[in-house]
Amino acid sequence: MSSSPPALKKFRKRSPKSCLICRRRKVKCDRQQPCSRCKERNEVCTYADDTIDKMNVGPHPSHSENASDSETTLEVSPDINPKKNEKFDFYGWRSLFELIKYRKDSDMCSSRPSFSIQAYSSYKDNVVVESLANLLPPFCISQKIVNLFFKTLNVVCPIYDQETVEKSLNNIESPESFSYEDAFTLLPIIAATIQLSDLPDVILNFYNSAGITPLESSRLINLKLNEISEQEYKHLCLPDKEIIQMLLLRAYATKFRTRIRGVNTDLCRSIHVSTLVTPLFQVTEKIGKNTSDLWFALCEIDGLECVLKYRPPFIQHDTYGRLKPLRCFFNDDISYNFHLLLGRLLDCGVSIYKSVHSLTVSKFIDKLESYESQLSLILVDIEAKFYDPSNEDIQFRYIFLKMVFWTARVNLYQCFITLDSGILEDEETIIGNLGESCIQCVRLLISQITILEKRGWLLVALLEIIHALMLAAFCRDKGFEVPSDLGDITLYVQERMVDIVTFDDGMAVRFGYVLRFINSMLHPNEPPMQDAEPETTEDPSKLFADIFDFTSNYFIPSALLDQ
């Protein structure tokens, strides 16, 4: 018994009538300009015919036209495909970029354009919004936390716009107005801010009365946000700006400032979303402040990872890496000048990192004078624009810029400790510059440790101090004279690290050994530190790199040994 041949797949015989957004959502479109659904969601409404006209290409772009600039195209024989003139329903990267580059009317430029599909309504219903709202403190407490956030965490990396956040904050008192976007704006801010070590008493009293610690509350908030954001990924819903902001804030406020080991996974995720899902890197200042500043904040965090933690940059090797801010990003001259100087420091620091790992010794020495000149000019501007002990907000910016400055200068010279004596013609001067930079960095951070702790930068400051002390100890072996009071600083750092870091797998013992080794190198004639643990046979420099999860070329850059 013969079976009937399978039915041929029916091809679309007419051009799609719905707009691109409605077709992607698989909902009915009323074909207006814009359609009612796009107008309601304040999204760009574009039809296939409009996109084709703008691109000035054939009736429908084919796969080959969009995937490659090659003139060679695949031809299908008529007997295989009898409908060779049928138009395929395909929209390639050119069409997507047309949507990205679409500009709104001038009266809409101040609002943040949305390039992503909103979450399914099943995740935006009242039940989900209510479950998120229940995690928020009362309005008065939330307001104090938000104000603290903009005075501390948002100063260095401006991820959020204060006016937008305040609008979401005001919706707390109006449940009918509180939305999914409001929740995903406020909750990451609150979760990050309540992790600060020096919270005001009114905030601490609220959490004590609620029977929960701020850290536990932060953990619960992050778990809920993860649950909902992962549901969106499962349903192939592209995250909107609130998801990108959440990832950036975690990358900066948690992984960067409060973790010793491991890759900054949230930074990796935010880069992925910002490049492959919602391509912020293609957006310029011409579209609007509130879109471009997210990419700028991401580039700053990437630069800080490279300079302060000496990790390879993800973005700065790319042509889209940007560290120069635009004036329209900021509401005041102080913030703009701060990020202008920070961008210059990070740009110089990243360039130093690249040179250390790509040039030979002789070529790198030829660039020392140029880097020194750049850093000196930046230091003059820092002293002129931000030294103001009477204003704590301005003074914190001053201290932070000086911390980045001295770290960049340490990074400029630290590679030379890996070379044997006699290789450098001016070894005494170079080692002296490194040792002096280390001492200046340590003195700055120790003297300003209180304000750094208040602003959430205690762990980063302690790590920079340990690194500088380690390098100063190596400089002493090469003839540099170190001050006599560094032993007390080493003991203080060890006590503070034990207080704020939870060690596991014997890391506390190994960490203490590294600090005792540093102290013994700085002051070889003094007795060992009290409560010393048994000595280990491990190489202290390798042990240091392992504790802080640095790569093996942290102390011995392979490119510098290739002479």
Swiss-Prot record:
The keyword Zinc applies. It comes from Schizosaccharomyces pombe (strain 972 / ATCC 24843). One of its GO terms (cellular component) is cytosol. Residues 19-45 bind DNA. It holds the Pfam family Zn_clus. Keywords: DNA-binding, Metal-binding, Nucleus, Transcription, Transcription regulation, Zinc. GO terms for molecular function: DNA-binding transcription factor activity, RNA polymerase II-specific; RNA polymerase II cis-regulatory region sequence-specific DNA binding; zinc ion binding. InterPro entries: OAF3 (IPR050675), Zn2-C6_fun-type_DNA-bd_sf (IPR036864), Zn2Cys6_DnaBD (IPR001138). Residues 64-75 have a biased composition (Polar residues). GO terms for biological process: positive regulation of transcription by RNA polymerase II. Residues 56-78 are annotated as: Disordered. Its main location: nucleus. This is Uncharacterized transcriptional regulatory protein C3H8.08c. It is found in: Nucleus. The keyword GTP-binding does not apply.
